[in-house]
Amino acid sequence: MFETLKALNPDPILGLLAAYRQDPNPRKVDLGVGVYKDEAGHTPILECVKQADLAHRAEETTKTYVGPAGDADFDNGIEALIFGADHGARRDQRLRTLQAPGGCGALRIAAELLNRAKAGAAIWVSDPTWANHVPLLGDAGLEIKIYPYYDGASQSLKADAMFAALEQIPAGDLVLLHGCCHNPCGVDLAPADWDRVAEIAVRRGFTPFVDLAYLGLGVGLDEDAYGVRRLASAVPELLVASSCSKNFGVYRERVGALSLLCATPAQADVVFGQAQNVARGVYSMPPNYGAALVGRILRDPAATKAWEGELGAMRDRINGLRSQLSGKF
């Protein structure tokens, strides 16, 4: 059986990391895998995560399954963090959120769900986009299409070309948008751009799908969530795949979520059930430990404040290093 399989080329991201490790140049800079490092080149565990870990270990009484939707405290906490606790979509009970194994798990569950809803649906991704978007979405059966986004020569957004492309996308298609900290180009939509995207989406009838992997690491939590919140206030349907790997530093715990906005609460219940059914057939139950820690932090105001302080320190360091690096060229 296995003799039919062919050797694959190295993953473009992981292959770059391997090349970096083999390069003897002492002045090399690692711009590969998106992992935060401190001044010593170490990826630390946040103090708030350590404290949540201690409390969780002291109180945990079982290792039984949590169900396909995952940890309820985490689901509620991450939804409130992304959309805002008092967002109209939450008040109207049109939002549902389920835990997933990282942002990748959320993307794949969304893709499988969308293909179940409309087989072979077209999803438009930015040029460029994160390398793993194409296999995660395309291998689930979605048709990948591309819209212009970044001008490498001017290092700026191709705003006119992007909006012109969005104006041609038909109803029933999906548009993948980077919520903040666009990977790989780093050029984000301004609030006015998000306003225009929302207006076009409503008028044209396409469904926005936001990948939110870096919430809080761009400008700030509320600023980085502007696009998602603006879309959720305008469109009848929206998908958001989020990750806690970067902003909580829980990379190996695989903590992510898929949030689904639907036109009515009844439709939201149906879609939520379908999403859990998809998850049941892919990985059955999500891992609980990391999500339990994040959920604990988000339900405790003091712990949340401590996390926001640590997140701000990471954000300031990242932005400072980016500024220093750009000054070298």
Language model segments and positions:
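Conserved C-terminal alpha-helix-loop-beta "cap" of PLP-dependent enzymes
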Residues: L17-P24, A119-G120, V134, T264-S284, ...
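Short catalytic/ligand-binding loop motif for oxyanion handling, primarily in non-cytosolic enzymes
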Residues: K37-G41, P184-C185, G249-V250
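N-terminal "arm"/small-domain region of PLP-dependent enzymes with the aminotransferase-like
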Residues: M1-G70, G77-A80, P287, A291
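Acidic, glycine-rich loop-and-beta core segments that form the ion-binding/anion-interacting portion
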Residues: L189-V250
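A cross-domain feature marking catalytic cores of carbohydrate-active enzymes
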Residues: V33, G179, V210-L212
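Conserved core segment of the aminotransferase class I/II
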Residues: S233-E308
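Conserved core of the PLP fold type I
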Residues: A55, E60-R203, G216-L217, Y226
